[in-house]
Amino acid sequence: MTKQIMPITLSYEPAAACWGEKALISSSEQGVMVHLVGKGKLGAVQRAGRKIDGQGIRHVALVGEGWDLEKSWAFWQGFRAPKGNRSIEWPQLPAAEKQELESRIKIIDWVRDTINMSAEELGPEQLAKRAIDLMCGMACESVSYRIIKGEDLREQGYTGIHTVGRGSSRDPILLALDYNPTGNPQAPVFACLVGKGVTFDTGGYSLKQSSFMDSMKSDMGGAATLTGALALAISRGLKQRVKLFLCIADNMVSGNAFKLGDVIHYRNGKSVEVMNTDAEGRLVLADGLIDASKEKAKLIIDAATLTGAAKTAVGNDYHSVLSFDDKLADDLLTAAASENELFWRLPLAEFHRSQLPSNFADLNNVAASPHTAGASTAAAFLSHFVEEYQKGWIHIDCSATYRKSAVEHWSAGATGYGVRSIANLLLAKAK
């Protein structure tokens, strides 16, 4: 059976009146036309891609004038979906733009595919392997790594990852990946990336309701996003040494799972009382941040699907940014704007660091009433594990990583959002 390919063209004129006053697309024997009138043209192209896919059209060609890199990418973002096969015949682009488009497709599609995998398919070991495979596919000669898993984590002092992950039949893992293109094993580490990789989150004994648990295969979105960001930065020419720490575990209920009231003792001397096992992401990230701080890198970025509070604040369209470093926060917002991604800064102040009191440890893993700024106190908790937290450290609460249902510009599932912005920031800081 011959594959039917639908031509897609762009127009800057409104559709004919018969299509409706606000019609985004119209069709004829020549194919489908996308009508770009008013502001927000990239968003309109992405919505058109989603609408065309919704009509069951799976094979298209972007033809005619106006299809530059960003419009082509916007169309793919909307057109792509987790089920079924799709193909696009791309427009002719300059060589550099073609290479960038191919890199985005390879890497950000990897991020989306990885996050969309079921928890049965993607456990801690599988996530670590996928990250290694992607990075080796980008620059294998410059990549080395070590994996610490299971009881070795406890013996080597990675108490947060071990505590959260010990309740699962699948061993928790720390993946420490070193991208060093300099050829010098003594080269300084320019940046450290620390990602939350909870491959399924039941909430532990602070058990989630089904309506909150059903998307928790995506709770490793921070780890996937940072892996993709490093890969994209490499494809764009990053030549500085970067270390990636993925803190990977299942948060399950079992006779061996951690419990409310347990106290975790970390390598940096901090002790943490667990008063909510569903605030587990910060417990695993703490181990990665301790390692990152030891590297004395000038830039530390952590990313995690950390709090519902951030999503309540900014919705599903923005990632949240929290940092004590105003310049660094501004730099990330600038990077995001240049990559056509939406980030929003949430407050983080010194007083948030004291809103985690415990009667039995240095810190509580959740803030006590009346301290209700959940995203801010979660970031404040993390700051206790960053040596120089006031400068060079930024926390991204990944509110836009995953959608439980389709909207007008995204299919259901992972978005790959944030990969471009973080890659942009890495390159800007590496200059």
Swiss-Prot record:
Any matching Pfam family: Peptidase_M17
Keywords: Aminopeptidase, Cytoplasm, Hydrolase, Manganese, Metal-binding, Protease
EC top class named in words: hydrolase
Catalysed transformations (reactions): Release of an N-terminal amino acid, Xaa, from a peptide or arylamide. Xaa is preferably Glu or Asp but may be other amino acids, including Leu, Met, His, Cys and Gln
Membrane spanning stretches: none
Named cofactor requirement(s): Mn(2+)
Molecular-function GO terms, alphabetical: manganese ion binding; metalloaminopeptidase activity
Major localization class: cytoplasm
Cofactor note: Binds 2 manganese ions per subunit.
GO cellular component: cytoplasm
Enzyme Commission code(s) on record: 3.4.11.23
Record bears the keyword Aminoacyl-tRNA synthetase: no
Residues where Mn(2+) 2 binds: K196, D201, D219, E280
PANTHER family per record: LEUCINE AMINOPEPTIDASE-RELATED, PEPTIDASE B
Family: Belongs to the peptidase M17 family.
Name recorded for this polypeptide: Peptidase B
Species for this entry: Photorhabdus laumondii subsp. laumondii (strain DSM 15139 / CIP 105565 / TT01)
